[in-house]
């Protein structure tokens, strides 16, 4: 029988995988609420590092609001939007993006530990590395989706949205499969 992981780390791995599954579920729900509140286009830039912090001053809020005013969603649908209304939609998108970043870090940091401690066999190491690449791809697809609504449309491309959601479901399914597989092999 093939050994997938070192037995002494099985509890740690189970907690990690369950937390990842929960996190993906939360991100999908927040993403759905972002979509339902038409908030997805409120952040018109993709600042992977500097976008970690939301606007903190009135001047920064004005800058972000002015960027939003340049896209069709604002000037065709939301011309009368106030700053306080903009902040609401901004925070929905911001929370969705920050949760994605946290998920990426929460996946990567234990993965580095897993590689250092050689917890998984080589096959599973490769599988989890591929999952990490898919998480990075998910962030890029999210931006690719948002970008589709910044120029000519007032919403994002439904096709890109479907790709974004389906990749989240693929990630969830793969992690759940690993969880089940690891636990069935360890019994």
Where are these regions (language model features)?
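N-terminal signal-anchor transmembrane alpha helix
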Residues: 15-52
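Hydrophobic cores of alpha-helical transmembrane segments in multi-pass inner/ER membrane proteins
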Residues: 103-109, 165-182
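Long, glycine/tryptophan/cysteine-rich extracytoplasmic
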Residues: 49-72
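C-terminal ends of transmembrane alpha-helices
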Residues: 29-35, 136-153, 184
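Individual transmembrane alpha-helix segments
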Residues: 67-107
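Membrane-interface helix-boundary motifs at transmembrane edges
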Residues: 7-10, 115-126, 184-187
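Non-cytosolic membrane-interface motifs at loop->transmembrane helix junctions
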Residues: 152-164
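Membrane-interfacial loop-to-transmembrane alpha-helix junctions, especially the N-terminal start
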Residues: 12-17, 122-132
């Amino acid at each position: 029988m093939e050994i997938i992981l070192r037995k002494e780390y099985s509890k740690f791995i189970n907690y990690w995988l369950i937390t990842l599954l929960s996190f993906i579920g939360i991100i999908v729900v927040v993403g759905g609420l972002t979509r339902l509140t038409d908030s997805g286009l409120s952040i018109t830039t993709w600042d992977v590092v500097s976008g970690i912090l939301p606007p903190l001053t009135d001047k920064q809020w004005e800058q972000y609001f002015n960027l939003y005013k340049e896209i069709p969603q604002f000037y065709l649908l939301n011309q009368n939007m106030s700053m306080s209304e903009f902040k609401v939609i901004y925070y929905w998108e911001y929370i969705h993006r920050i949760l994605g970043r946290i998920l990426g870090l929460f996946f990567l940091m234990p993965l580095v530990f897993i590689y250092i401690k050689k917890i998984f066999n080589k096959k599973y190491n490769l599988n989890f590395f591929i999952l990490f690449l898919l998480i990075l791809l998910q962030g890029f697809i999210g931006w690719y989706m948002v970008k589709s609504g910044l120029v000519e449309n007032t919403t994002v491309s439904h096709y890109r949205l479907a790709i974004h959601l389906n990749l989240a479901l693929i990630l969830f399914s793969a992690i759940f499969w690993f969880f089940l597989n690891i636990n069935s092999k360890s019994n």
